[in-house]
Amino acid sequence: IEVLVEVDVGAHRCGVLPGAPALELAGAIAGEPGLRFAGLHAYHGAAQHLRRPAERRAAIARAAELASETKSLIERAGIDCGTVTGAGTGTFALERDSGVYNELQPGSYVFMDADYGRNERDADETRFEQSLFVWTTVMSTPAPDRAIVDAGLKAFAVDSGMPLFSDAPGLELTKASDEHGVVRVAAGSAGPKLGDRLKLVPGHCDPTVNLYDWIVAVRNDQVEALWPVAARGALT
């Protein structure tokens, strides 16, 4: 069985410390007859949503440095370190260009979300379009400055903030309960009408997808496919 050693290169989540602790674990794996040390997992998740490009560059430069030093240490001990894997949607070009990583792991680029949309970007950075939306219907208009929609906490994740409305200027989703969302209508803006269908951009695409059994694939206002979310709830 091929095994990667996860190294903490700045995310402070899982992973052994770079350097000697990673070497010790790699050596233990290499010494087991049923295992083969395959390389390092050096993913810096926290860097993906650093807002300024300079912050992301600095974080990944340090991550790449730690990964490179650890790889060299392991190889000097006579253990092959064939893979260094990491990177995400917010930084993949930096890992790609580092000369250290030979496998990249971006995933959110397929859908994007409101939180990634808050990242500042350099002019030459790759930009991915938003493709994941949650449709919701206006179910009540109790006041000129307020509307209620039928999407709430059961329809989208809020760990990275409330969803944003797509193509609906002047509307802001300010609060969500299980099956209701409270919409604030900006002064001078035309409020939505009862029964209007509105399109939401989720704050965080990953846990939002996990709430659904199916993704409805639409092109030019026509449904082209239904994609099952096969891994929904597969948490063990």
Predicted regions and their residues:
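Generic structural signal for well-ordered, non-membrane alpha-helical segments
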Residues: 22, 56, 60-67, 127, ...
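Structural beta-strand/beta-sheet cores of well-ordered domains, especially the beta-sheet scaffolds
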Residues: 1, 33, 77, 82, ...
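Glycine-rich, flexible loop/turn motifs
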Residues: 12, 138, 223
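Active-site loop/helix belt of alpha/beta enzymes
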Residues: 2-4, 8-122
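Solvent-exposed alpha-helices and their adjacent loops that cap or buttress functional pockets
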Residues: 30-33, 76-78, 96-97, 130-131, ...
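C-terminal accessory subdomain/extension
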Residues: 141-236
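Active-site loop ensemble at the mouth of alpha/beta enzyme cores that anchors a bound cofactor
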Residues: 56-58, 91-169
